Amino acid sequence: MKKSRIYLLLLVVFLNPSYAQEDSYTSTVLAPGYNQLTFDAPVPGSYTLASYKPASNGNVIDADGLNKSLHDIYDDKIVLLNFMYSTCADVNGCPLATAVFHKIKNILDKDPVIGKQVSMISLSFDPENDSPDVMKLYGDGTDSGSVDWKFLTTNSVKDLD
C-alpha cells in the first residue's frame, strides 16, 4: 500500500504542470502589438492609415496540388494575406504571423456572418521545402466552416512576380 502511495505521489508530481521545467529555449516576442503595449495607443481617427491596394496576381498551388491564379482564390471576399514558410524558426516572423492569423480566425469564428466574408491566405515563398502536402499539414485543424483559410505554395518564387 505504501508503495502505491509513492507511485501515486510521483505520478501527481510529474503530471502537474506547475512542477514542469520551463523550456530552456524560450524566446522573447519582440514584435510590437503582440504583447501588452508599452505606450498609449493613438485615439481612433487621430491618424491616417496607409493606402492598401490589391496584391499582384501570381500562379499558386493549393494544398490539394491544384494550380490556380492567386486572384481566382480571392473569391470576391475580404482577403487577409500573409507570406510565410513552414521551416521559419524566427519567433517574430512566420510563427508570429500564423499565431496572429489564428487569433483573427478565432474572433471571426464567433461571428460567422462576417467570417464567411473573409478569406485568409497563408502563402509560402519557399517552394523548395513547402510542397502542397507540407502546406496541407501546416493548415490541418484550421477549417472551421465559417472562415476560409487557405495554405498555398508555388512552383517558384518567379511565379509570384
PLM features per residue range, with description:
Residues M1-N57, I61:
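N-terminal targeting signals for export/organelle localization
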